[in-house]
A protein has these predicted regions:
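Amide-forming acyltransferase catalytic core, primarily the GNAT-like/NAT-type
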Residues: 123-215
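Active-site rim helix/loop that mediates acceptor-substrate recognition in acyltransferases
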Residues: 13, 20-59, 167-198
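Conserved acetyl-CoA-binding loop-helix of GNAT-fold acetyltransferases
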Residues: 75, 81-94, 117, 121, ...
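A conserved beta-turn-beta hairpin within the catalytic core of GNAT-like acetyltransferases
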Residues: 62-70, 80, 210-221, 269-272
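Conserved catalytic-core motifs of GNAT/GCN5-like acyltransferases
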Residues: 62, 107, 125-139, 268-279
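Conserved beta-strand in the GNAT
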Residues: 47, 53-61, 69, 74, ...
Length: 283
């Protein structure tokens, strides 16, 4: 059996989608993003072949904090357990390292123990756990309360509030966008401030952005942290500002006291995930 990893091509779509379309009960997002991923200059897709037949794939995305994000790993059910996912991961690390990247991250569902074992084999370690919450059924956006949009001149204040928040520590200092995690470095926060994506209420800080995939459009609270009362008020002021969003997600690190406040407001957990990381210096 000959196994090989190579860059993805347009012709790989049909054989890969033949099994990917059945993943997650037919709700896998890969079919809706394949064409865009293939064209994306900020990322690279790879395919693993067995005897010349594409049976798996993954993608590397380069993020604004200088890290590489690994996503979209899929292997045909008939070929699992043969080291193909590890081949894809190791190839992605070599590819990213050759471009000077020293930090690699990925995520997996909190209950996907098989994936966690595979991830540990390529020497990634768990750094944080997150849950994603949604407003209650029948939610009607009614933004209210005090929220101040922070600007480029507020960098030092915002960095101080971020670093002092329990959520920053619990969440390994990252924010989420398009379901990828990047470090809230000064450079990244400077960009978010320039976008108008950073908000404050009291000592709480939130990052809010829009996301879209295929025909879907959603609102993301990419980061929320600070005292519970301030954070709750900030969420009341921010969630629902994007009137075009069909879904709204709030990313919160597990063990954050904000979670209890969300539940009291009727928010429900959509899913939970584990953040994994590997650094070049770690081997």
């Amino acid at each position: 059996m000959e196994k090989k990893v190579r860059p993805a091509r347009g012709a790989d779509k049909a054989p890969l989608m033949s099994f990917i379309k059945e993943v997650w009960g037919g709700h896998d997002y890969i079919p809706s993003v394949w064409d865009r991923w293939l064209r994306d200059r900020h990322g690279k897709m790879f395919v693993v072949e067995v005897d010349g037949i594409p049976v798996g794939m993954n993608r590397v995305r380069f993020l604004g904090d200088g890290s590489a994000w690994f996503e979209g790993a899929r292997v045909h059910p008939a070929f699992r357990g043969r080291g193909l996912a590890s081949m894809l991961g190791e190839n992605s690390m070599r590819f990213a390292a050759a471009k000077g990247v020293g930090v690699f991250r990925l995520t997996s569902g909190s209950r996907n123990r098989a994936a966690h074992r595979q991830i540990s084999r390529i020497l990634f370690r768990e750094t944080a756990r997150f849950s994603v919450y949604e407003p209650p059924r029948g939610f009607r956006p009614r933004p209210a309360g005090a929220a101040t949009r922070m600007g480029p001149g507020d960098l030092l204040t915002v960095m101080g509030l971020l670093r002092g928040a329990e959520e920053f520590r619990l969440g390994s200092g990252v924010f989420w966008h398009y379901f990828a995690a990047a470090s809230l470095t000064e450079r990244v926060v400077t960009g978010l401030l320039a976008e108008g994506a950073v908000w404050r209420s009291g000592d709480a800080v939130a990052v809010v952005k829009a996301g879209d995939e295929g025909e879907g459009h959603w609102e993301e609270v990419c980061y929320i942290g600070g005292p519970v009362s301030d954070s709750t008020g900030l969420l009341k002021a921010l969630v629902g500002r994007d009137k075009n969003a069909s879904e709204r997600f709030v990313f919160v690190p597990q063990r954050s006291p904000i979670i209890s406040a969300l539940r009291k407001e009727g928010y429900g957990r959509n899913f939970s995930m584990v953040l994994f990381e590997r650094r070049v210096a770690n081997g």
